[in-house]
Design a protein with these regions (language model features):
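N-terminal leader/targeting segments and the immediately adjacent pre-domain N-terminus
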Residues: 4-6, 20-113, 142, 341, ...
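Bacterial N-terminal signal peptides
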Residues: 9-18
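Active-site-proximal loop and beta-strand segments within enzyme catalytic domains
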Residues: 76-78, 84-86, 114-121, 125, ...
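Short, small/polar residue-rich loop motifs at catalytic or cofactor-binding pockets
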Residues: 90-93, 117, 419-421
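Short, acidic, Ser/Thr-enriched surface-loop or helix-capping motifs
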Residues: 99, 428-429
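Active-site SXXK
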Residues: 102, 120-145, 171, 228-232, ...
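Active-site helix/loop module of the DD-peptidase/beta-lactamase fold
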Residues: 139-178, 207-209, 236-273, 278, ...
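Penicillin-binding protein/beta-lactamase superfamily catalytic region
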Residues: 242, 257-399, 404-427
Length: 435
């Protein structure tokens, strides 16, 4: 009995350690926009100057009343709704802002959120890190995107010789080839949990192997951008938070200082893949920088070529293609909203397991005891390329093929950064609300 108590005491002490992955997983659970409260933070200071968007008078904000087509999934119907109607019906909305020509056309906050509320933007941070890489490239700290990662982190040569063939451009495009699963399940023993909640990011990187050759295929994972953040720090000799402050937060006239999570106080490696904490208006200023191809009121912060590449539709990864360019997403699949009926739930689950390209928003029982699924991302497939081109009158950006047939990828000029909890920074240099 005494021995049991001794062992239990050791376990309890370990669980109480703040850097313990298991402790954090149990205490904080799944990802939350307030996760920054669980981690040590470094401040991304803003300067004394402020840039402020103009605000359209409330009487002129036509987007408040404009309706657009939106599916009402419970009945499988298409209906017209205002933006307010759509956003108020969703769960856990926080904030939404639409800016056009430096003027706020629409702005809403929900619940306890307001104009000053800051939250963790998760993987939108990846696009911010890409931007910071572009700044370092523009300033000559990074010589070329074809540079090997080991030029900046030489100790990785001893971890795995494949790191010598890993280039910065592979990190930007998610084609690093790392054997790392982006698993958000509440599992404190997963690689993702160890990276996100652990206290030594470099150890995770050094112990990770490669599943395939760098540049070969697109495979999204946060460890890739974690490495990119370290490359930027090594190249500049400046901590991530300080460099982001000097080159972006101060020049862009941010309203508030931001913060970035770090692995722990000893190693101080920034969570460059998910840890930035800011507000929507300041995040919109990053969008403005890209809309102006890296120029901020006459100052070229980012090289315009780097921005153009980031905002250029292209497929990355030879074997598994991704709609991802310099850590920005582009393009959309042509999708159909439809309903599919099944005899039972098991049949439904088996179908979607075999057809991973089809997603559903909702499912419900019908009066006969079967199931109906509302599909919202069912790609419009064609048996051959000719049929596809005829359907779209040859107006298609890219044609791809899977085992289900040929499908189109359209590009309307928009690009976006995306976070796991639905955070989106969308920019479109070609979009005009009024002609």
């Amino acid at each position: 009995m005494i021995r049991f108590r001794y062992i239990l005491s050791i376990i309890c002490v370990a669980m109480l350690t703040t850097s313990c992955v298991v402790t954090r997983a149990i205490r904080y659970g799944n990802a939350s926009v307030d996760d920054h409260r669980a981690f040590d933070q470094e401040v991304v200071s803003n300067g004394n100057d402020r840039f402020r968007f103009a605000e359209l008078p409330m009487s002129e904000r036509t987007l408040d009343t404009m309706k657009f087509v939106w599916p009402y999934y419970g009945k499988g119907e298409m209906q017209q709704h205002t933006i307010d109607e759509v956003t108020s019906s969703a769960v856990d909305n926080a904030a939404l802002i639409i800016i056009h020509r430096d003027t706020i056309l629409y702005e809403r906050y929900f619940g306890e959120w307001n104009i000053d509320t800051q939250s963790q933007i998760f993987s939108v941070t990846k696009s911010i890190t890409s931007m910071l890489c572009g700044v370092a490239l523009n300033e000559g700290y990074i010589h070329s995107l074809d540079d090997s990662v080991t030029d900046y982190i030489p100790e990785l040569k001893d971890a795995d010789p494949t790191f010598s063939r890993l280039k910065i451009k592979h990190l930007l495009d998610m084609t690093a080839g790392l054997d790392f699963d982006e698993n958000y399940a509440l599992n404190p023993f997963s690689k993702m949990a160890k990276l996100y909640m652990g206290g030594n990011s470099m150890r995770i990187i050094e112990n990770t192997k490669f599943s395939h050759e760098p540049g070969e295929r697109y495979h999204y994972n946060s460890l890739t951008t974690a490495i990119l953040g370290i490359v930027i720090e090594r190249a500049t000799g400046i901590p991530y938070a300080e460099y982001l402050s000097q080159k972006v937060w101060q020049p862009l006239g941010m309203e508030q200082s931001a913060t970035i999570g770090i692995d722990d106080r000893r190693h101080r490696v920034a969570k460059s893949y998910a840890g930035l904490v800011t507000n929507v208006r300041d995040l919109a200023k990053v969008g403005r920088l890209y809309l102006n191809y890296g120029n901020w009121n006459g100052i070229q912060i980012l090289d315009s070529t780097f921005v153009s590449t980031s905002l250029s539709p292209r497929l990355v990864g030879e074997k598994n293609l991704g709609l991802y360019s310099n850590s920005w997403y582009w393009g959309t699949y042509d999708e159909e909203l439809s309903q599919r009926r099944f005899a039972n739930k098991r049949e439904m689950n088996e179908y979607y397991k075999e057809h991973p390209t089809v997603s559903t928003t909702n499912s419900w029982r019908d009066k006969n005891g079967g199931y109906i699924a509302a599909e919202y991302m069912r790609r419009r497939y064609f048996a051959d390329r000719e049929s596809l081109m005829d359907y779209y009158n040859n107006d298609v950006h890219t044609v791809l093929q899977t085992r289900d047939g040929y499908f189109a990828v359209q590009h309307n000029g928009g690009h976006y950064a995306f976070g796991v909890l639905g955070q989106i920074l969308y920019i479109n240099p070609e979009k005009e609300f009024w002609q």
